[in-house]
From Swiss-Prot:
<dbReference type="GO" id="GO:0003723">
    <property type="term" value="F:RNA binding"/>
</dbReference>
<keyword id="KW-0479">Metal-binding</keyword>
<dbReference type="GO" id="GO:0030145">
    <property type="term" value="F:manganese ion binding"/>
</dbReference>
<dbReference type="Pfam" id="PF01351">
    <property type="entry name" value="RNase_HII"/>
</dbReference>
<comment type="similarity">
    <text>Belongs to the RNase HII family.</text>
</comment>
<comment type="function">
    <text>Endonuclease that specifically degrades the RNA of RNA-DNA hybrids.</text>
</comment>
<keyword id="KW-0378">Hydrolase</keyword>
<feature type="binding site">
    <location>
        <position position="118"/>
    </location>
    <ligand>
        <name>a divalent metal cation</name>
    </ligand>
</feature>
<dbReference type="GO" id="GO:0043137">
    <property type="term" value="P:DNA replication, removal of RNA primer"/>
</dbReference>
<keyword id="KW-0255">Endonuclease</keyword>
<feature type="binding site">
    <location>
        <position position="27"/>
    </location>
    <ligand>
        <name>a divalent metal cation</name>
    </ligand>
</feature>
<protein>
    <recommendedName>
        <fullName>Ribonuclease HII</fullName>
        <ecNumber>3.1.26.4</ecNumber>
    </recommendedName>
</protein>
<feature type="binding site">
    <location>
        <position position="26"/>
    </location>
    <ligand>
        <name>a divalent metal cation</name>
    </ligand>
</feature>
<dbReference type="InterPro" id="IPR036397">
    <property type="entry name" value="RNaseH_sf"/>
</dbReference>
<feature type="domain" description="RNase H type-2">
    <location>
        <begin position="20"/>
        <end position="209"/>
    </location>
</feature>
<dbReference type="GO" id="GO:0032299">
    <property type="term" value="C:ribonuclease H2 complex"/>
</dbReference>
<dbReference type="InterPro" id="IPR024567">
    <property type="entry name" value="RNase_HII/HIII_dom"/>
</dbReference>
Amino acid sequence: MSKTSMQMGLDFTLVAEVEELVAGVDEVGRGPLCGAVVTAAVILDPNRPILGLNDSKKLTEAKREKLYDEICEKALSWCIARAEVEEIDELNILHATMLAMQRAVAGLHIQPKLAMIDGNRCPKLPMRSEAVVKGDSKVPAIAAASILAKVSRDREMAAFELIYPGYGISGHKGYPTPVHLEALVRLGPTPIHRRSFAPVRQAYEALEGLVQV
């Protein structure tokens, strides 16, 4: 998937009746050693409530999958965006995350009056923005964004498991678990690993040392 590719959805039916459009924005994948950082922006429809929204990490996989479909169906507008591994290595993970959030908001077909961002800092956006610490547990639109981002990234990690067997990617989703770290040492890094992250950098250095010998 290219760095500019996005998934989008919208429902114009009730846009005119909503006076204050608020987008929730969240990210998944800052901590993993491999794969893109994925973001989502969601504008919920107040006339089509979605029950059970919560921080995606607090939901079961089955519940997230169900809510993913419901969010895509009922939200006024939504967009899933990303920053690729190459961008993470070039910019650093913080700036790459901010870039991916900007892409998610820019991909909305309806411009919100306010963007509520999970965390303690906001990307530069053309509308008013507000950072909300633990926002995915407090703001429904942010919770919805966290679900879209996590389901999308988890699906991608499951696909990578087939391409790069032996790393356990579908289980740890790229996070630096003992299983992942051991595989990184044993098998070496893959093209989807983030060179700027210390364990990956050390794995490359170890390989280079072996080649020199």
